[in-house]
Structures are given as C-alpha cells and as structure tokens.
C-alpha cells in the first residue's frame, strides 16, 4: 500500500455511511485523502441526476462504489429495491463516472455471492460463471454484467473500471438486521441466546480492513496501469469456517455466559458453502489477508464491547502490519 498515493487524493465514496463505507472513509481520512461521501437518506444512487451532480462537484480522481442493498434475507422481502439499488444504482454510478473527466480509477464493489453457486466445494475464481439463486446474489451478478458492459463499451481505457468481490466481512460497526455478527451482539447485550440459522454453512470470514486493503490496492494499481477487470479478495482457505464456529468464537470472546442456539423457524435458501480464490490479487496487487479468522473475531468482539473508540486504534494496528 502506497500511503503517499492517498495524501490529498480526491476520493468519492458511495455508501460512505454504511459498515464498510465508514471504515473506508475513516481510513482514507487518516491517510490524508479528501473524501466526498454520498449515502442515504439524503443521497440515493437511484437518483442519477443527484449522483452525477455530486460527483461532478467533487471532481474525484478515484471513486469507490459501495452503496448497495447488502442483505440476502432483505432481498427476498423487497426484491425490487434490491435490484434497483444494486443494478440500476451501479449503472448510475458508471454513468456519473462517464460524465466526470477527473476520474482515473473506479472501484465497483460487488460480492462473493455474484457467482453461480451450485453447491460444489471448490472456491470461486474471477472467471467462474456468474449467477444467483436469491435476489441479492442475482442482483450482484447483474451488476457485474453491467460493469463489464460499461468497461468494454464506454470506458475501455480511462478511467479504469474494476469490480472487486470480497468474502463475508466482519468487524465493528455493522448494525444490520439479519446479519450474523450484529445479531449475535444484540443478543449477547440483551443477555439472551442468539438465534442462528444454518449453523453448518461455511463462509469465507475476513476482517473488514483486509477487504478494504484489497480495494485500495486495486485503486492504486488501476490508477497507474491496466489491470484485469475483476479481483477476488478472500481469506486463506483455512479461514473458511462454519457459522457454528464463528458463533462459538464470538460467544467465547464476549464472555459473561453469551450463548446461541439454532433457530427452528423456516428460512429462505442460503448456499451451504462459499469460498474464493484470490490468486490474482496476490500475484498482481501484492495483496494478502493479514488477519486470520481467530484474530478477526477477537478484534470484532472487542470493538463491540469497547465501541467506537477502537476504530482508529484498529486501523493503526492494521497499518503497522503492512509492508513499509
């Protein structure tokens, strides 16, 4: 990571007030970047005129598009909002990039769930088939197709448009409903057993800063030279763990009798297994995950127990792990 690259760099972040967006904005601010954020409730990526005007006024050199409806269960409840936000919102971000000459690199954040998951245990690589059984996963696959179409049709040289696909990101500050870590924390704080669905499913758990580190490396490289159009950022294979493992680890770190139990209610389908191959990012960007699953859980639980005071401390501790 080139810290000097980010000093005084003009960066436009959609979804800057969300879970990953808050961490990214804080990190870039610490690096000296001039960050402009665009988020709900006042700023909606489904409003093209508003987004284009905001981006034009900011004159960013780098855009990182994070804004999304990011929950699988919510996508079953409101598929229309999921598709309009994740697909049309992405198209609007790309249209705004087209209309903003200052942009040199556009990082479009999708998801590891953009791949057609047939239940096989093999990790997904960037060239695997896209697809999605649930509305959320399908919307991210559709967003990937839109990104590729804009890259080939309208933005073949500059700005360079890259899609980035991370695993299941955990860390402090995620308060989403129907997401594992926030649900655990809410139950632990209330002194109640957390209700967990599908405890035997396997996911590529990774700390939020590991994923964001990949995004900023992709932006740095895309700013300077041509790179492939998509990158996976997933943890080491050994850190693809079950939901049961993560719930047990969070409860143990939390202490105080924290516990969970498997929900007996019926739930919408979720893939049994998910993992990523990140060879391309390792070879071309020099990216590698710095925190193993155990450390990621410890940092996450500690943040929720000590709240926001740990955000800057954990960013600084993570940066100390980076090569000089």
Placement of each model-derived feature along the sequence:
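Conserved glycine-rich Rossmann-like NAD(P)H-binding loop of the short-chain dehydrogenase/reductase
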Residues: 33-40
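A short, basic/flexible loop-to-alpha-helix module at the beginning of a structural domain
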Residues: 1-9
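Rossmann-fold scaffold of SDR-type NAD(P)-dependent oxidoreductases
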Residues: 14, 60-66, 108, 232
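Catalytic helix-loop patch of NAD(P)-dependent Rossmann-fold dehydrogenases
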Residues: 77-95, 99, 104-105, 114-169, ...
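C-terminal substrate-binding subdomain of Rossmann-fold SDR/epimerase-dehydratase oxidoreductases
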Residues: 31, 188-324
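N-terminal Rossmann NAD(P)H-binding glycine-rich loop of SDR-like oxidoreductase domains
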Residues: 11-27
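NAD(P)H-binding glycine-rich loop region in Rossmannoid oxidoreductase-like domains
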Residues: 45-85
């Amino acid at each position: 990571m080139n810290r000097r690259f980010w000093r005084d760099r003009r960066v436009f972040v959609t979804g800057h007030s969300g879970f990953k967006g808050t961490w990214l904005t804080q990190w870039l601010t610490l690096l000296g970047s001039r960050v402009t954020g665009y988020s709900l409730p006042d700023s909606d990526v489904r409003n093209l005129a508003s987004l284009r005007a905001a981006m034009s006024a900011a004159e960013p050199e780098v855009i990182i598009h994070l804004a999304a409806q990011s929950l699988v269960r919510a996508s079953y409840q409101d598929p229309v909002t999921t598709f309009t936000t994740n697909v049309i919102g992405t198209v609007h971000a790309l249209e705004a990039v087209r209309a903003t000459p200052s942009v040199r690199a556009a990082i479009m954040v999708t998801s590891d769930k953009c791949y057609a998951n047939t239940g096989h245990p093999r990790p997904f690589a960037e060239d695997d088939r896209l697809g999605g059984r649930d509305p959320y996963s399908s919307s991210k696959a559709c967003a990937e197709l839109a990104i590729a179409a804009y890259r080939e049709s309208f933005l073949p040289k500059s700005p360079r448009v890259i899609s980035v696909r991370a695993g299941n990101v955990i860390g402090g500050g995620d308060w989403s409903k129907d997401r594992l870590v926030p649900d655990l924390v809410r139950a632990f704080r209330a002194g109640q057993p957390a209700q967990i669905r599908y405890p035997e499913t396997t996911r590529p758990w990774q700390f939020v800063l590991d994923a964001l580190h990949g995004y900023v490396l992709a932006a740095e490289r895309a700013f300077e030279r041509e790179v492939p159009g998509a990158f996976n950022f997933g943890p080491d294979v050994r850190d693809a763990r079950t939901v049961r493992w993560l719930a047990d680890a969070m409860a143990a770190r939390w202490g105080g009798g924290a516990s969970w139990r498997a929900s007996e209610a019926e739930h919408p389908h979720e893939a049994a297994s998910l993992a990523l191959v990140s060879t391309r990012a390792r070879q071309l960007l020099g990216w590698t995950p710095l925190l193993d699953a155990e450390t990621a859980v410890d940092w996450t639980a500690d943040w929720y127990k000590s709240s926001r005071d740990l955000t800057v401390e954990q960013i600084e501790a993570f940066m100390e792990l980076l090569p000089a």
